[in-house]
């Protein structure tokens, strides 16, 4: 069982009615809820989203062992709970028709661009496949029209001969939606990590805090 209260063991009816390949795909996900934990995904307006395995939303949970409030801290409660008392886990997720959970990003890392969500994790997973790249990180940076746009930060295998920006865009162009394409591609010698090896995106966001992207052609021209 995961800390979220989900289990990866498939129910008997699913093992009987699905192929081995489908079962493998299900087991790659975080699993279905366990007894005593309710899960749903909601949009920014706290509206429940469909369990279709595709629609992404904020994962919220409730149950007898789930925190119901912070003691004497109204500001924290307003941020951590929906109006109906569901607790925000801080994850972006999907739920399918069998109520199997899949985590796709952290709420603080997802990029909200023109009313649509871009998963930083999905974009990073594609970017690390670029020939000559050893590590990738994606953050959202302010944009004068779209609110946020993705910035792709790459660590090249050879810092003296990094991939060209055109080759990066050509590689990603066949693998991601057009509107997911990063507005800015930056090469760095290294990306900051914490003690556990996790990328410190807060440091990257601080580094690009004063960056403001514009729609091309730039209004500054």
Question: Where are the regions a protein language model picked out?
Answer:
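AMP-binding/adenylate-forming catalytic core of the ANL superfamily
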Residues: 63, 68-69, 78, 92-180, ...
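Flexible lysine-rich "adenylation lid" loop at the C-terminal edge of ANL adenylation domains
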Residues: 46, 188-208
